[in-house]
Structure formats: structure tokens, C-alpha cells
Amino acid sequence: MIEFGNFYQLIAKNHLSHWLEILPAQIAAWQREQQHGLFKQWSNAVEFLPEITPWRLDLLHSVTAESEAPLSEGQLKRIDTLLRNLMPWRKGPFSLYGVNIDTEWRSDWKWERVLPHLSDLTGRTILDVGCGSGYHLWRMIGAGAHLAVGIDPTQLFLCQFEAVRKLLGNDQRAHLLPLGIEQLPALKAFDTVFSMGVLYHRRSPLEHLWQLKDQLVNEGELVLETLVVDGDENTVLVPGDRYAQMRNVYFIPSAPALKKWLEKCGLIDVRIADVCVTTTEEQRRTEWMVTESLADFLDPNDHSKTVEGYPAPLRAVLIARKP
């Protein structure tokens, strides 16, 4: 059973304590009414994993845990089998005692692009919106964060996160809650807020930016990573039925237009930190994610276009500050 009591106890003692006015009731409602049909199967996989305290833990350069003595073949097979019960693994990679989860996305590449542009994360309380399996939460802890909180309503991601946490010695510095951003009150409590790979899925992108701003302390930093297109500050692509085979893509602005949106929401010191083409080396099918991936979503004769004829995925990182 996945429980949230440790998180409640943790925030009861800090500046997130006011969240407890609504959070336990939201989680209780989720447990009672909203659990996925496969959730018990996934949570059983987590329960059957051994809780191991790593002899060596590297969260600075990767998410890697090692034991002092190699695990037995039987132990490794058990861990491998249980983790495969949580497929597909989209965000990673993870190296856990010799079990290497080669995820669809090389999320470590994204982190290496983003990290040089961030304010020092040492001692910070961080929110990661749409955090997936929580890979970047662990990298934030590795970069010195005091507490990293992720929210993502996808319940498989919650189970993947809890599986990794258990294999990292039940580390309590990172937490994932099965919520969407619209379920959060204006907490105004996080030093840094990340939203990576979320904005283009929102029907109202400016509302999403306001929601992110409402989670920041004054002088807090927003890190926004999203799909963009080439163009000036007035350029926005509104795809038809699908973009790269995704149905739920609503608005893809240019990076200059996105900068303008952030400024319109009252954020300051907005800068375009990085713009990068997504390659089929960064997002691809693996043995841990065996269905279609980016190569299947691009025009087979012209990888500069999606199968629908739109510009191929281009991603930008923008950094802004709340005054």
C-alpha cells in the first residue's frame, strides 16, 4: 500500500503546513474513488520489492544505486521482473544494483541542458509539475535541494517513483503526489517550480502559467520547458486533430511568443535559456518501453516534419522570476 503519511508529517513542520488543510482529503478521495483498474497490480509490484539501503548512491551525475556486495542472481532477477511489471518506463534512466532501466526518454540529457541555467538549488524547496516517474526529482536532490515535490496524476508514474524510492533506501527527500496542478491551492511556498513537457497539453496555457506563478515564493524561479516552433513573438501553432500522433496538443508558441506570455503573467527577468531539436536518440523505443516512439511519429522521408506535416519537435527552456 502506498501511503502519504511521511509527507504529511514532513510538511507539518515547515512552510508547506497550510497545504494540510486540503491535501489529506484530496488524497483520501483519490484512494476511494479514482484509482486505476491496474493500480493494485502495480502497487503489489512495489510492495514485493526489497527495501535496500545503497552502499553507494549517485544522484548528482545520474540515478545510480550500488550495494557493497553484488546482489545474487536470484535477487537481481526478482528486482528486474518486478520493475518490468511497471512498464512502460518513459522517463529515466535508472541504474539500480545492476538492473539498468533504459527508458524511452534520456531525461538525463534534458537535465544536463537545464541545470547550467538554474539558480543554485542548494537548500531549496522545489515543485515539479507533471514530473512523470520522478527522475528529475532525484536529480534535484542530487543538486542540493532540501525537498523535491512532484505532482502527476498518472498512477503508473506514482508506482514507478515509489519503486525507485524503495530501492534507494526509502529516501524521504523526494515525494510524488497523484494530483494535477489545478488541484493545488496558491501555496506560494516553493523556491523553484519546474514545468517540463506540460504546457502544450493545456487547453489554457496562460492559466497554467498563472498556476505555476501561484506556487512560487516572491523572488522564486520558474523553469519552463515545452515544445516551440520557429517564429517571432506573434507565432503560435495550433495543431489539428493530432501533433506527432498526440491528440492532446493545443498550443505550440515560438520561444519569443512564450517569453511574451510569461511577461504578460507578471513574471520578470524572462530569458530563453535553450532551444533544442528532439532527436530519435533522445526519445526512442527500448526494451523497457516497447511501443511506438518518436521515430514512428516523424515523416519517414523527412525527419524535419511530423507524420501530420507539422514542424518536428523543438523544445525550449525558459527561465523567469516572480517579483
UniProtKB/Swiss-Prot annotation:
Catalytic activity: carboxy-S-adenosyl-L-methionine + 5-hydroxyuridine(34) in tRNA = 5-carboxymethoxyuridine(34) in tRNA + S-adenosyl-L-homocysteine + H(+)
Binding-site positions, carboxy-S-adenosyl-L-methionine: K91, W105, K110, G130, D152, P153, T154, I181, E182, M196, Y200, R315
InterPro entries: CmoB, Mo5U34_MeTrfas-like, SAM-dependent_MTases_sf
Single GO term (MF): transferase activity, transferring alkyl or aryl (other than methyl) groups
Family, similarity comment: Belongs to the class I-like SAM-binding methyltransferase superfamily. CmoB family.
Purpose: Catalyzes carboxymethyl transfer from carboxy-S-adenosyl-L-methionine (Cx-SAM) to 5-hydroxyuridine (ho5U) to form 5-carboxymethoxyuridine (cmo5U) at position 34 in tRNAs.
Assembly behavior: Homotetramer.
Protein name in the entry: tRNA U34 carboxymethyltransferase
Native species: Salmonella arizonae (strain ATCC BAA-731 / CDC346-86 / RSK2980)
Gene for this chain: cmoB
